Amino acid sequence: MQTNSSNSVPSAISDKYTQNHMPIAIWLLICCALVFAMIVVGGVTRLTGSGLSIVEWKPIVGTIPPIGQEDWEVLLEKYRQIPQYEQVNKGMTLDEFKGIFWWEYFHRLLGRLIGLVYFIPFVYFMVRKRIDRLLGLKLLGIFALGALQGLMGWYMVMSGLADNVYVSQYRLTAHLGLAFVIYAAMFWVATGLISPLNTHLSDPVSVHKLKKFAWMLTGLIFVMVLSGGLVAGIHAGRAYNTFPLMDGFLIPPAMFVLEPWYRNFFDNITTVQFDHRLIAWLLIFSIPWFWFKAKQLSLSYSGRLACHLLLLMLLIQAGLGITTLLLSVPLTFATAHQAGAVLLFTAALWVCRKLS
C-alpha cells in the first residue's frame, strides 16, 4: 500500500506541473504555428521573386501599407533603382509590382505579429510570476533569437540590393535555418511543459539508444533543411528535373567544375542538388529502420504514434520533393514541400520528446 502511495507522488507532481504551465505551453504552441506560417509565406515570397520588392527596413513605420497611387509610385521607383529590376523585371507595371510587394509586406507583417504575440504574453506571465528563473532564461533566449532573426532577414535582403539580382544563398540559408531553430526551441519548451515526465515500458538502455538515433535523425533533417536553403538560393531545383538519376547520371560529371573545390558545395547547381538528394536518400533509408527498431520496444501509445507520424511525414515529404523536382518547381508543390519540411522536423522533435 505504501509502495502505491509513493509511486503516485511523481505522477501527482507531474500533473500539478503540467496544469500550472498549460497556458504557457499553449501560448508557445500558438507561436510555433505562427512561425510555421512565417516559413511558408517566406517560401512563397522567395518562389514568386518578391523578397526584394521592399528595399527599406522600417520596423515601425513599415507596418503601414501604401494607401494611395502616390505611395505606390514612390515604392515602385525605389524598386527600379536595384539591379533586380534592371536585369530581371525591367518594364514591370505597377499592378505587377503590387503582386510581388504584398507577399513581402505580409511576410514582414507576420514577423512583427509574432514579436507581439510572443512579447506581450511573456511580460504578462512574468508579472503574474508564472515563470520560474530557468524557464524565464529559456524564453528570453528565444526572444533574443527572434530579434536576431529580424536583423538576419534585413541582412539577407541587403545582399540583393547592390550588386546581385537575388539575395545571397548563404544569408538565405542562415535565415531559414534560424527560423527552424526558433521553431524547435519553442516547440521543445512547450512540449516539455505539457509532458515533463515520461515513463517507458521498455528497458532504459534500449530507449536511450533509440533516443540517440532519434536525435541523429532530427539533426539530419535540419541539415537537409539547410541544404534546401542552398537549393532555393541558387535555383538548383530547376535543373536535373529527372528522378531517380540526374539527367541519366548517378553522379553527374559537373560536380567539381568550380575552383577552389569547396565552392562546389555552395555555388555549383549540380553539387548542391546532388547533396540535397543524397541527404534525402539517407533519411529514406534511416527513418524506416528507426521505425522498425521502435516497434520492437514497448513504448507508450503516444510514443508509438509519434514514430508512426514520423514515417508518414517522410513518405509525404519524399513524394512532394520528387513531384516538385519533376515539375520544375511549381509554386504549389514547392510551397507544400517547404511546409512538409517543417512538419517532418516537428515529427522528429516530437519523437525525441516522447523518448526523453
Swiss-Prot record:
Entry membrane topology: Multi-pass membrane protein
Pfam families assigned: COX15-CtaA
Alphabetic keyword roster: Cell membrane, Heme biosynthesis, Iron, Membrane, Metal-binding, Oxidoreductase, Transmembrane, Transmembrane helix
Localization in the cell: Cell membrane
Gene Ontology terms for molecular function: metal ion binding; oxidoreductase activity, acting on NAD(P)H, heme protein as acceptor
Domain of life assignment: Bacteria
Binding site for heme: 276, 337
GO biological process: heme A biosynthetic process
SUBUNIT field: Interacts with CtaB.
Name of the protein in its database record: Heme A synthase
Organism (species): Nitrosomonas eutropha (strain DSM 101675 / C91 / Nm57)
Lineage of origin: Bacteria, Pseudomonadati, Pseudomonadota, Betaproteobacteria, Nitrosomonadales
Gene name of the encoded protein: ctaA
